[in-house]
């Protein structure tokens, strides 16, 4: 039986937990909202935590009938180069995780899917962002027309799972969410990790938790 992680996310160990006592807005941009919290450390001292509030996102691992996966290449300005990625995108206000996954898959790649499976959730930048990414698998794909956002440019291509895993091992794939997706893909294809597949309107799909922003202690002086 696998060992349990030493710290369950829903029941933090009081010896490690930090408690927010005040918050200051640092930046309120078009995409990013950065804040600075004063937190009480486990030993009673105070410290500052600066981080970005993020609404959450989804990533899709699209499986073609012949076993290939659908990928993208997109230029990422902060790192100055084009990266290989799985399709992904940010949640719109009040948008469900699966609805976002369906929308992003069609907008970015043109594909629609008949079946979906929720894999799990990853936190790509835990040191300075609340961002979470829900991982969805999609199959029964039908090709169609992209509907890219204004100012969005990307190439869509397909690859075998073996090629993708080789690129990950060789450093050709460095995007964190795509590396996490490749781990899921490898374990699903090997049968080690199971998925529950269903049509998009099926009630079996879970409703992944939305963004969990740090809560300030109400009795802070």
Where are the regions a protein language model picked out?
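Unchanged
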Residues: 47, 56-59, 64, 90-176, ...
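Short glycine/serine/proline-enriched coil/turn segments at secondary-structure junctions
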Residues: 29, 78, 125-128
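A glycine-rich, hydrophobic loop/mini-helix early in the fold
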Residues: 54-81, 85-86
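Short helix-capping/linker segments at secondary-structure and domain boundaries
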Residues: 185-198
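Acidic, metal-coordinating catalytic segment for phosphate/diphosphate chemistry
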Residues: 18, 23-59, 65
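Extreme N-terminal tail/first-helix region
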Residues: 1-28, 197-218
């Amino acid at each position: 039986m696998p060992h349990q992680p030493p710290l369950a996310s829903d029941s933090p160990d009081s010896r490690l937990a930090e408690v927010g006592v005040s918050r200051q807005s640092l930046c309120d941009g078009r995409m990013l909202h950065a804040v600075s919290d004063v937190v009480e450390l486990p030993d009673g001292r105070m410290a500052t935590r600066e981080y970005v509030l993020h609404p959450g996102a989804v990533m899709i691992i699209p499986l073609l009938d012949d076993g290939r996966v659908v990928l993208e290449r997109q230029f990422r300005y902060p790192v100055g180069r084009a990266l290989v990625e799985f399709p992904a995108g940010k949640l719109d206000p009040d948008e469900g995780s699966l609805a976002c996954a369906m929308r992003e898959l069609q907008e970015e790649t043109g594909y629609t899917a008949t079946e979906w499976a929720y894999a799990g959730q990853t936190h790509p930048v835990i040191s300075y962002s609340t961002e979470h990414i829900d991982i969805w698998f999609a199959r029964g794909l039908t090709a169609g027309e992209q509907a890219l956002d204004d100012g969005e440019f990307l190439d869509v291509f397909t690859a075998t799972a073996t090629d993708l895993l080789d690129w990950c091992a060789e450093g050709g794939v460095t995007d964190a969410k795509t590396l996490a997706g490749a781990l899921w893909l490898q374990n699903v294809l090997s049968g080690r990790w199971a998925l529950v597949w269903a049509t998009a309107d099926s009630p079996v799909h879970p409703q992944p938790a939305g963004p969990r922003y740090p809560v300030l202690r109400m009795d802070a002086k």
